[in-house]
């Protein structure tokens, strides 16, 4: 048995991935934003992500919004994928099959799902009141109304399969796809209700809907690119109630469709709630019915979603890796949107690499082996780890920043990168103190 996690993956949105610094139009959050940077910055950003992955044992980069007219469309993606392939890194698209713009996220292409819905409004799902199913995203989480398709509509399903065949034929360099059925709610039309048999009628996301399309979608991908990664997003932890049917002794027709998929299929799970609540232990194992597949556990550590962008999450990532390994998964994923110039992001990324290689290592091992050489020694690395908690304790920040100022004098100007990391941390902490003090004064 492998004593490490084989697959290490970055998850990202195109519009909030910022590895090229000081760019106009930079965004730090969102799920449905326009792309506001210069078109050429898209490839420049992701080349730097690829370089990091190549240098630090990361296998792949997933991108939401990969195909978009605003940053070069197919030509830009082919250039990026070619660069990544030369570096031994896989670029894969993250795409909603029934939502999120489909395969071509934004543009005039016929393979942009939004364009298809304009011409085929009968393919949009229905809510409980029989009205079209839309989610109206509000800033900072997006800007546009987003429709959710009807998974029971044959015309829509054929369009989805055709779009997958098209993209993997058009971009042979593409490394795979993370498929999502869409998490904008579930269609409540009579056909969908009958097909689901009420199993997950109250779930915001339907596992039955996933089973209805994932096997056919995977076959469409592999018909054009047999070595492509196909990652089936579940939106759940495998322990969640919505996934209880994976333990059924007598699989439903929906479940059997998933179980019959090839062994090379990936299933992807998320762990944030269970990490933070402690509702995932080393004794918990993947459902036996899924043992033949490959599995990735993703978290939102240090992001716009959980804990805040650029926050230090070393122990959280350690637990993600340890529990994933103990549960029988083979891979882990975190967001890779922030540049490694941001010292906390750098240490989070290094933590994923370190604990994927050594799932039973401790935080103290990481401090000794990884942080200490980059911060001036173990004593200082332990200080950094402690100061990393201060965004949640702003009253301590002035003392911490004073300590950073004093210890910087010990390094002189000989090791630029050590100084850069400490100065970045001081500036990051000061921003939280400034806001805390300003709110308190007002």
Predicted regions span which residues?
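Short acidic/polar active-site loop segments enriched in Thr and Asp
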Residues: 59-60, 175, 330
